[in-house]
Amino acid sequence: MSDDNFSRGDHSDRLLYCSFCGKSQDEVKKLIAGPSVYICNECVDLCNNIITQELSQISEDGESSDELPTPAKLSAALDDYVIGQDKAKRVLAVAVYNHYKRLRHQGKTDTSIELGKSNILLIGPTGSGKTLLAQTLARVLDVPFTIADATTLTEAGYVGEDVENIIQKLLQNCDYDVEKAQRGIVYIDEIDKISRKSDNPSITRDVSGEGVQQALLKLIEGTVASVPPQGGRKHPQQEFLQVDTSNILFICGGAFAGLERVISDRTEKSSIGFSATVKSKEEGRSFSEAVHRVETEDLVKFGLIPEFVGRLPVVATLSELDEEALMTILSQPKNALVKQYQHLFELEGVELEFTPESLREAAKLALERKTGARGLRSILESALLDCMYELPTRNDVVKVVMDATSIRGETAPLMVLEKEELAKNA
């Protein structure tokens, strides 16, 4: 049948009807044909109106405007994965909520008031949960996320990574969708390692310290970065992608070892004379106690340039994890290490049991090694290595029990054989 039969006023062979509303071609202005299906112009207009209404309820970043989690919900989501650090969670939750609330209402509020961006600085010892906090926030908000290592960055023109590479990694993680990338989260780790070597500006060029801080300034504050397209050098004829970093949330984290001494020098200046208080090194404040009193001048004294500190107005401090916290980390969070290894053993058809003493011993070892929660995996991996080597070739083991001595490596884990289990239950 020719297209002529679908136009209004054509009374040739037979009368055609809209498959959706049932009106004939004489009752509408236009009838559009598909494979054995027809739709009139009125139904097309109705469909367009429905789509327009639905799109108006969707915010620019693809989420419903009422789906932005409140600070309380964000903090609760962090509780599922990160143990302790309640103050840091609260600071992060409020900062992230305000950041994305600002993005959702851009252009909708009083144009005379421009809301600034508040990037975040996380200060805490190794293994205290800095990276995990940032990762969890990105997962909860369903936004692109990338981690950059500040120690690999150098000024443009020197051997090492340029700061623009950070944005390229973010683009890669969202399939080069520029709009999505411009609302993502970037976590820059080891930010304390790019502190300048002394308080006074150096005559020689510091390309991996102060130079990197200078290069990061514009990126963090907001600039348009030129990033090679997908394929990079393979397609040099393609134009560079322009990414506006004004709405990207930057979270910088570092251990800042030695910062407690800088803070103590400021807060506990010894008096002179007979009233002077003599303190031994042992009496000095611990990192966790001192770091909560950190001020901008302490970070500048440590080696961050004032302009860089000014771009990170929100500071969240994390405490050192104690033995009880490490034990909880092993077993309580949704992705706890104990649960991960138990699932791994389940895939072999074997039950894995950890005694309370074994968890305490693993926590003690992590404290001794000063590796925090990050060191727990290597401790369990080492203790379970022989079991994971043997089990795939054995079908007589039904259960493995870990105690304190097996965690220390003094004895092998207890393997319960199938016949022993049957005899016990008989």
Curated annotation (Swiss-Prot):
Domain of life: Bacteria
SS bonds (residue pairs): none
Xref: InterPro entries: AAA+_ATPase, ATP-dep_Clp_protease_ClpX, ATPase_AAA_core, Clp_ATPase_C, Clp_protease_ATP-bd_su_ClpX, ClpX_bact, P-loop_NTPase, Znf_CppX_C4
Residue ranges constituting the ClpX-type ZB domain according to the UniProt record: 5-59
Organism: Marinomonas sp. (strain MWYL1)
One GO term of the biological process aspect: proteolysis involved in protein catabolic process
CDD domains: RecA-like_ClpX (cd19497)
Protein's name according to its UniProt entry: ATP-dependent Clp protease ATP-binding subunit ClpX
Gene3D superfamilies: 1.10.8.60, ClpX chaperone, C4-type zinc finger domain (6.20.220.10), P-loop containing nucleotide triphosphate hydrolases (3.40.50.300)
Binding site for ATP: 125-132
A GO CC term attached to the entry: HslUV protease complex
Function: ATP-dependent specificity component of the Clp protease. It directs the protease to specific substrates. Can perform chaperone functions in the absence of ClpP.
Tagged with keyword Zinc: yes
Subunit structure: Component of the ClpX-ClpP complex. Forms a hexameric ring that, in the presence of ATP, binds to fourteen ClpP subunits assembled into a disk-like structure with a central cavity, resembling the structure of eukaryotic proteasomes.
Protein keywords: ATP-binding, Chaperone, Metal-binding, Nucleotide-binding, Zinc
GO MF, one annotated term: protein dimerization activity
